[in-house]
Amino acid sequence: MSQAIPSSRVGVKINEWYKMIRQFSVPDAEILKAEVEQDIQQMEEDQDLLIYYSLMCFRHQLMLDYLEPGQTYGNRPTVTELLETIETPQKKLTGLLKYYSLFFRGMYEFDQKEYVEAIGYYREAEKELPIVSDEIEKAEFHFKVAEAYYHMKQTHVSMHHILQALDIYQNHPLYSIRTIQSLFVIAGNYDDFKHYDKALPHLEAALELAMDIQNDRFIAISLLNIANSYDRSGDDQMAVEHFQKAAKVSREKVPDLLPKVLFGLSWTLCKAGQTQKAFQFIEEGLDHITARSHKFYKELFLFLQAVYKETVDERKIHDLLSYFEKKNLHAYIEACSRSAAAVFESSCHFEQAAAFYRKVLKAQEDILKGECLYAY
């Protein structure tokens, strides 16, 4: 009978696997995952290591769902099925296992656009952060927290965390994708501060880095974010130009990104009064929505149709705003209500316009309250 493989040796390999996951290196991560699974069959009994393996399978699938949404890998369990395995461990987790369990669960909730839930898990994970010695893992934590607070429009908190993450990533060339993503978050925060002149250099730096590493997905996302920044600053012409560039790359290289790009393009055209052209892109966007992960963008396209068609569908607008309210997406409520108010105001329906402007003010108030997300 062959000698059992020490669990410590398998643990080292899982650490290497995680390193490849954090670098978004799918081929290397796949190879190491297969090697770990083979080693586990011959490994000495170690329940902690098996839990660590389950957590890493979950994190691996989160990476794949982000980079290759809709792609299937044989008969592997989905991220939702994997969630069940890490939610019911055989014993109470402590130390690093507890940290990873909370941190990865927060990432899952973030991907589901449940930002309040995500931040709740991140806050619990933060209590275990002192035991994390790996500098890159600390950067990962600060990046994910900054990303969540950015989406909740807690701008100062987001900026506090993202600058810590970027400071680490910039010293590690293998983490260029995380550097790009950190630049996105910084630029987004500057946009929220209405310092558009400070946002664009970060986005242009991200685009340059994405082109240097020849990553089509992040080239498209960089162009999309540049377009969004121009849109927020009121430069419709430059916004449409960059949306079109992002759409071209998306159609050719990253089709799963296309609905998001076409939504931004459609909304900018609608606000600019070019509704006929916008509705062509809305139809194209809806045609590309197949995956469950795109449900959010389907709702946004339906919002544009409800607001900008000849007869405004006020009931549909309220239904969609209720959908955003359930998810605490106050920034979307603010932006969508503002668009609806402007349309009603332009057609001299001042009562309806006033009602939607009140929703804008309420959303701004909710953003400032921040759901008490960092009240300890």
Q: Which positions does each model-derived feature cover?
A:
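Residue at a conserved register position within TPR or TPR-like alpha-solenoid repeats
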Residues: 20, 61, 102, 109, ...
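Amphipathic alpha-helical segments of tetratricopeptide repeats
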Residues: 34-41, 77-91, 123-134, 163-174, ...
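Flexible inter-repeat linkers and adjacent short helices
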Residues: 1-105, 282, 324, 332-333, ...
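Helix-turn-helix repeat elements of alpha-solenoid scaffolds
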Residues: 21-38, 66-85, 113-124, 154-164, ...
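Structural register within alpha-helical repeat arrays
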Residues: 16, 57-59, 105, 145, ...
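Long, ordered, amphipathic alpha-helical scaffolds
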Residues: 244, 251-376
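Loop-centered beta-sheet repeat module
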Residues: 159-229
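Alpha-solenoid helical repeat architecture
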Residues: 5-6, 45-50, 93-100, 133-140, ...
